[in-house]
């Protein structure tokens, strides 16, 4: 019997690769997506399409009510999405307070309920400079907590924690993945803007892999 794992699946290219890596490794995947009031809700549409295509158990949980507690992020509030590379100081406005701790806590609870021993999520080195909850020390401390928070121990596993988006895409290309149903742009428009830090990092990853990004841009 295949080992069960929960994959936090946003619908973006990183978590899409993580999802497929888990399947490639023979895991029985329980995909978990969250609507936390993000303006780039199109990523959830992509997640739904992919999970149907892969016949993966998929839950989308509406936790948008927590927006009342998470003010100050351009991803959820009426604040302009900054343009430019992730290293820019302005990109800190895209931090959603305590987001990954909240999502991981819910994913761990789900893992316990379905008998999964691991929760996969797509943190990578390109996020370390801006997002504290994507750094190795955060994953380490969360794992310490997850060992004692329940009777059942659950491991948080970030397969790409030490590599960047370019390396993630390279692994996806090796797996033969099609990224046309992934969404990265932080703006909630019909086409990707190509200007926000998230878009720029994605475009750089495709360029560095000598590959063409299949999604439409403005």
From Swiss-Prot:
Biological-process GO terms, alphabetical: queuosine biosynthetic process
InterPro entries recorded: QueC, Rossmann-like_a/b/a_fold
Key words of the record: ATP-binding, Ligase, Metal-binding, Nucleotide-binding, Queuosine biosynthesis, Zinc
Bound cofactor: record note: Binds 1 zinc ion per subunit.
NCBIfam families in alphabetical order: 7-cyano-7-deazaguanine synthase QueC
Membership in a protein family: Belongs to the QueC family.
Protein name: 7-cyano-7-deazaguanine synthase 1
This protein's encoding gene: queC1
């Amino acid at each position: 019997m295949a080992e069960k794992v929960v994959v936090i699946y946003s619908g973006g290219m990183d978590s899409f690769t993580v999802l497929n890596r888990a399947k490639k490794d023979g895991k029985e995947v329980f995909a978990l997506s969250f609507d936390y009031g993000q303006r780039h809700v199109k990523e959830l549409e992509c997640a739904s399409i992919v999970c149907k295509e892969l016949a993966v158990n998929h839950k989308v949980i509406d936790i948008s009510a927590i927006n009342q507690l998470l003010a100050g992020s351009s991803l959820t509030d009426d604040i302009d999405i900054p343009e430019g590379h992730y290293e820019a100081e302005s990109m800190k406005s895209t931090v959603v307070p305590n987001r990954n701790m909240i999502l991981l806590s819910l994913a761990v609870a789900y893992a316990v309920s379905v008998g999964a021993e691991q929760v996969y999520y797509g943190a990578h080195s390109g996020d370390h400079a801006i997002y504290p909850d994507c750094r190795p020390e955060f994953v380490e401390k969360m794992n310490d907590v997850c060992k004692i928070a329940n009777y059942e121990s659950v491991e948080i596993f970030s397969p790409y924690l030490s590599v960047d988006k370019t390396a993630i895409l390279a692994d996806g290309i090796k797996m033969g993945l099609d990224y046309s149903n992934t969404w990265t742009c932080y703006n909630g428009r019909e086409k990707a803007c190509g200007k926000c830090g998230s878009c720029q990092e994605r475009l750089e990853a495709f360029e560095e892999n000598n590959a063409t990004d299949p999604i439409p841009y403005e």
